[in-house]
């Protein structure tokens, strides 16, 4: 965070920051980043694709200018699901840089005026009609998430990721396993996934998939594991730790190439 603040120089007009660093899972203090940016006259927004649905957000309280995110991760919208945006009220009177008919005032939309009649809210930043099949799953997921409560989801997320890190520390950090944790240990500094590093991360990633575990590989040596609080149990996490151990004990990684041409 200090490096980011140091980069907020007089040459910077707009800062777009990740809420969570996608490799290691570090959670930025978005309130602090907003404050520091505004002190310097910088407009600031956040890409919250890796935090939405697992971390509470208070954009209006923080005064953040804008944010956006996908809904196919913790929001359970599935691949190709509709994305979302937040625009602070203080910007609602501004003209979107790319205005589209779906951002028009609904009452005049079909008058097809030559001049854009803004919807006067974050809706104005919509461009075209969203597809219903890409949006419907999000509605169902939101109902479940409201019932569970984002604070409860966050609490379980911290506990279950903490448990995963504990298992790796206790069982898998020494020889011959040599797994390490790239994710910050402090609760306030981590999001919903754990970055596990290993010199053979790519081959381990493939071995995990073959065993029914769905991780992500990120260069050069990170395996991302994301226990989704809504439906992943502590027993599931324990079983993943056993698989991480077994693929080393049984030499399973030797079955896989180190060729990294595949996209994960």
Residue ranges, per PLM feature:
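Active-site C-terminal subdomain of aminotransferase-like
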Residues: 76-81, 86-156, 162
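PLP-dependent enzyme catalytic core of the Aspartate aminotransferase-like
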Residues: 5-6, 207-264
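Helix N-cap motif at beta-to-alpha junctions
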Residues: 197-202, 230-234
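Conserved small-domain helix->loop->beta segment predominantly found in fold-type I
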Residues: 122-128, 145-197
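Active-site phosphate-binding strand-loop segment of PLP-dependent enzymes
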Residues: 1-49, 74
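Conserved active-site segment immediately N-terminal to the catalytic lysine
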Residues: 42, 46-48, 52, 58-87
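Glycine-enriched alpha-helix->loop->beta-strand junction motifs that scaffold or abut catalytic
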Residues: 11, 62-66, 212-213
């Amino acid at each position: 965070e200090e490096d980011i603040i140091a980069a907020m120089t007089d040459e910077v007009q707009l800062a777009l920051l990740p809420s969570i660093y996608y490799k290691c899972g570090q959670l930025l203090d978005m309130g602090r980043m907003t404050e520091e940016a505004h002190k310097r006259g910088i407009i600031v927004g956040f890409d919250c694709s890796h935090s939405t649905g697992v971390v509470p957000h208070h954009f209006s309280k923080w005064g953040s200018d804008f944010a956006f995110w996908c809904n196919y991760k913790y929001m359970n919208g599935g691949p190709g699901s509709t994305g979302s945006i937040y625009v602070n009220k203080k910007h609602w009177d501004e003209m979107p840089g790319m205005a589209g008919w779906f951002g028009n005032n609904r009452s005049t939309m079909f008058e097809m005026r030559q001049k854009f009649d803004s919807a006067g809210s974050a809706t104005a930043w919509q461009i075209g009609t969203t597809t219903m099949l890409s949006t419907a799953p999000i509605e169902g997921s939101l109902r479940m998430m409201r019932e569970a409560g984002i604070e409860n989801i966050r609490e379980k997320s911290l506990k279950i990721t903490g448990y995963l890190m504990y298992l790796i520390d206790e069982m898998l950090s020494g020889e011959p396993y040599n797994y390490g944790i790239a994710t910050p240990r402090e609760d306030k500094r981590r999001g919903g996934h754990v970055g596990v590093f290993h010199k053979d991360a790519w081959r381990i990633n493939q071995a995990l998939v073959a065993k029914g575990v769905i991780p992500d590989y990120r260069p050069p040596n990170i395996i991302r594991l994301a226990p989704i609080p809504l439906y992943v149990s502590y027993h599931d996490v324990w079983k993943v730790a056993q698989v991480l151990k077994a693929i080393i004990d049984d030499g399973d990684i030797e079955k896989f190439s180190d060729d990294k041409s595949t996209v994960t």
